[in-house]
Amino acid sequence: MKFVRCALVVVAGMWMWTAIASAQMTAQKPDVPVDKWTGKTILLIGAHADDDALSHGTLAMLQAHGNQVYILTLTTGNVGTQDPKLSRTQLAEIRRQEELAALKDLGIPGDHYINLGYDDGLLEFEDRKAVVENLVRWIRKLRPDVLFAWDPGKNYQRWHKSDHRAAAYLAADAARAAMWRLLFEGQITQEGLKEYMIPEYMFYDDFDYQDENVWVDISDFVEKRVNADAHYISQFGPGWKNYNPNPSEAEVQQMKAQALDFIRTRDGARIEGFRYYKGLPDAIGK
């Protein structure tokens, strides 16, 4: 009988969490519009040093409005080139410097950039538990009010290329794990951290916009986004195949023009779109 009672308690507890999560599945919008956010801690988790580019206008706006923006990159980006002259070590350092230059143009401090150092292109094959534990540690340290990440998908697994796909699910799994005291409890008992539940999420994608429910007007921050994007010399334009740390003015202007063309327009405004979610991490994909 005692076993039965315990089993019923466990089932009831699981049902309660599921019921709460289910109640939060409907489409949402933030209580306060994104352009009015202030005093928040923002954490973006991405796979590569340019993944945040899709949100650069929003991130620049949030930093300018008195929020603290942090960028966490899982890999060093040490594979993403077609230039045979570059080694992994060289490319990793190039991409780090490009990211720091981009963040400077956005107004985000350099010490708000975190790189976990995993190899580019192989994120899916890393020790998943170790990666999630590392992410949980940073979530518990920074205690973000909002997490930006690749969209893991709503009601289905969203297609991304490998590292983006891995980053989407690693971020979601870490958000869930961070709230449970007995998961990675050494961080709490030995490192002085505390469990933490992220209350709000902003998920993004590069081409699939069907699940978006929030569009941020970045018209006043387009120049910052374009200038920041132009620092990714090794990734965009001719630098991907033939890296030159000092591109010509014509090449820089071409990169800026491409960056501007990539920014979407909605109702006459330059925008960035997101799938906003607020609630328990268990229902992120619902």
Regions found by a protein language model. Give the residues of each.
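Metal-dependent de-N-acetylase/amidase catalytic core
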Residues: 3-6, 23-45, 129-286
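Hydrophobic transmembrane signal anchors and adjacent membrane-proximal interface regions, especially
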Residues: 4-10, 60-63
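Bacterial N-terminal signal peptides
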Residues: 7-19
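A periodicity- and composition-biased signal for non-globular, repetitive helical segments
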Residues: 8-11, 101, 231
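Charged, amphipathic alpha-helical interaction segments
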Residues: 18, 104-107, 230
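Active-site rim/loop-helix segments in enzyme catalytic domains that contact anionic ligands
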Residues: 23-142, 283
